[in-house]
């Protein structure tokens, strides 16, 4: 996959696609079931967005499509578009791409902001700039997650 260029779409075996960023999204069983029906009827309409990590391609956008493909025996490959991104940018892309249609839940936004600050070491100001948001938005998302108990946040 070393010759895969940014923006290029390739067919990738479903079994090779990782979900390390799945933890930033809440499960939605109804939406996933609807996606299974759609993929069974129409096939894959839009490519996944993936970034490359040492383990292989990791989904940034298309978690429901990947989940649907895993339940459909006839679907063994998915089309994926490569996005070149470091860790903070990958998280920002998840927020940006998933905020287009059905808006992400505040808890999902908080998980990403928390990861950018606590795991990636960015300041709140840097996170605000990266995400194109106001510092107060970042502060509110951090406060939301940090006020929840550890048990509720997982």
Regions found by a protein language model. Give the residues of each.
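Short, charged/polar connector segments at secondary-structure boundaries
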Residues: 1-83, 94, 100
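Amphipathic, charge-rich alpha-helical segments that serve as recognition/docking helices
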Residues: 24-26, 67-147, 153
């Amino acid at each position: 996959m070393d010759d895969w260029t940014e923006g290029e779409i390739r067919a990738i075996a479903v079994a090779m696609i990782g979900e390390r960023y799945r933890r930033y999204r809440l499960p939605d069983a109804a939406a996933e079931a609807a996606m299974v029906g759609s993929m069974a009827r129409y096939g894959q309409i839009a490519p996944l967005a993936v970034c490359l990590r040492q383990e292989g391609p990791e989904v940034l956008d298309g978690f429901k499509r990947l989940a649907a493909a895993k339940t459909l025996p006839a679907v063994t490959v998915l089309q994926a578009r490569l996005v070149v991104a470091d860790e903070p940018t990958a998280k920002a892309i998840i927020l940006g791409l998933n905020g287009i249609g059905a808006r992400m839940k505040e808890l999902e936004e908080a998980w990403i902001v928390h990861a950018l600050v606590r795991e990636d070491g960015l300041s709140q100001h840097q996170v605000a700039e990266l995400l194109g948001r106001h510092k107060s938005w970042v502060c509110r998302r951090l406060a939301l997650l940090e006020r929840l108990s550890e048990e509720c946040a997982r």
